[in-house]
Swiss-Prot record:
Residue ranges of the region described as Disordered: 734-762
Taxon lineage: Viruses, Duplodnaviria, Heunggongvirae, Peploviricota, Herviviricetes
Protein name, per record: Uncharacterized protein ORF102
Bias type Pro residues, positions: 743-753
Domain of life according to the entry: Viruses
Amino acid sequence: MTNRYHPYRGRELLNSAIDHVVGRWNDADDVNKELEKLRADVDTYKTKFRNLELTRNATDTINVNITHAVEPTETEQTPGVVPQPTTVLSTSIEDYDRSGNEYRRLIGSLKYDDIVKSIYALRERMVYDRDALLERARTQFANPGFLEITSSHIQDALGNTQYKDWKMDTTIKIFSIAKHRIYAHMNREVRLIQQEPEPIDARLKFITTIYPSFWFKELIERGLQEDYNDVLYVEQKNLSLIDGANRSELAKAQSWAPDIHYLISRMCSSLCMVPFIPLTGNNMNHAVYTDTQLLIHYAAFSNPSLVNYKEMLKDEFAYVRDHKSALFRAFETTCIKFKKYKDKLAYKRQGTVVAPTAVNINGTPVEGARGPTPVPPEIMDNLLPFLIDNIIRYRAEQREEAARGSRSIMIERDSPIGRFINFNNKSARELESLVKKLTRDYAMSEREVSLKGLSGQELPVLDFTRTLFTQMMTAAMTCNLMANRYTFFDRVINLVDETTPTPRKDVLYTPSLAAFPGALFYTLMYDQRHPLTPGTSNSSASPYNIAEYATDPVRRNLYSWMKNFFRLVPGIKASKMNTKVYGLAGKYKPNSMPSCEGPGNPSDIKEMMKGLRFINLDTMIQFSNNNKQACNMVLADYLTKIQKTELIEDLSDFYGYMFDLTPPSQGVKLIKNDQFVLPDFNAGNFARFSSAPIAYYIETIKIEERETQRENYRSSYRSDEGFTSLFAGLLEQQQRPRVAAAAPPPPPQPPAAAVPTTQAST
């Protein structure tokens, strides 16, 4: 080694590396010590807070008012009189210099409970940030090559028009839900597989096929029994399969689209969304309320000891962020209360009624049936405060409020439940009809009507009341299926805090069956202690004959509903997915695709997200309105089967049908996402299956590309016969005598004048 490399001679490089590693170890130890100290402090204040929670509301908004006392001058001071402080302004504690006297006086004036509640709110924020960091770290450790999708990647992949629709969609957050990131991960895996070395035989080509879980593939092929080519899969026909030394004809190969998990999630969301179409003149925008949003707001209002609901309506994002644990306790309490109504209700395909049936969908009594109202009285007691007592008096109060220039928080106007009851187009017409009926029956004016003073027989039979209760029951019963309710709560509520490209702070409530679509399919296919009754098929690969139960009313409704939805899905070729997703383009040669760079390359991630068939919210609302009867049938069957079966407590060997993720043959690769489900049945795996019921497999098929043989077709005559006949014709023409050309005919003469004749001459 020359003197040029003298700095790297000896042990200098090793010592430098050791010093660097030791320094990092020391830094890590310091951070761990600070973290342990912080945890100890948090535990201490947590204990104090629990003691304080017994006497006071634990979730009041922390608002420290700084009161400036006006110092009296010497002329104003009166002996023996204590001057009273005057409030000048109220500011936040962060606005003060920590080294000033005002800050010290502020800290000294704070009460014990104010300090404890402030630290409790800080702890809530720390827990929220820690959970988000742990979720990201868990995904990266479980799948080191898993792609991290951001909103900019979604914008580049969808385009400006579809990205704008996605930004306005308050029911889904694509890049935050792990099961939707599997689309980009799947696309990348297929591209990596197609970069194998060039085969020796130039005639060999490959086809990479993608297919979903066996239960879904069998459900489409045997249950729906329709051709979904170019919708769910792409078929390649007339292929010559090569399997080692054997050659056999392969009729066709199917490659399924890798966005099926997203499609069924959007399909299930149509059951858990309620459109809000406001009346004109109320300055309200169109919105969509999900079942989880209605249930969480109902739980927050009905548990005042845990949640300050009016403070939540002032700033929903900040309140959910700072009081998420208290909101979850209220949500859990409400779900347990809803569970006791499970055995008392009967769900018909036209709506929700109480057994024995008292009313039908139109609110008219059923002959020979007497019983309680469709909605339990306890639920109606908590829904009545959301109802405006008299709309005429309300409008007069609003005019007075506008004249004063002040606007107070009203749960009847500012909450999702209140808006849906009072200002939705359809529910407002129902209330107006009820008011007119009361004025006719009791001979009173509309200003004298009090809706909150009605008995418990008029309001529960209205359509919007049953709709609210059915949606809340759907979210509650889906949550009760999960062993850990916090898993459900954390999945359906999402905080969006974005700074680019436009600032946005919002709370997204994902529909329950959109976040857990597997719960719907598993429940509707559940029958007699197992998902499907074993059919007559003797095939070991297909122990359940789905086609045999196509006449079952529950499955027939499910199949009809799925067929209607798949008609709205854009085609694979129309959306150009076959050009964006590797594995749908057909035959290829290795190394014919662009090189796949690392997962950290933004351009690669944007490329992997292209081709996703995004279905906007307007399309989903249109589908729900056009197929309302089919949606009601499926939802009624789902709620009815939940109350009759205990899926978690019933252990059966047939659970393996839905959880079977074993590759069917060698050479098939199973793509494991961060929601990978093990085949063993337990409560945790059931929750993971419900959130991500579709697993994808990749299989590479080797085929032979045969050269096209050109066929030369000849006449039935011999070739020399054609030449001989042609030569004989020429000789015959030469032997014919030549004839001179004839003179042209003379021009026609004009006709002579007619000569009259006599009869005799004639």
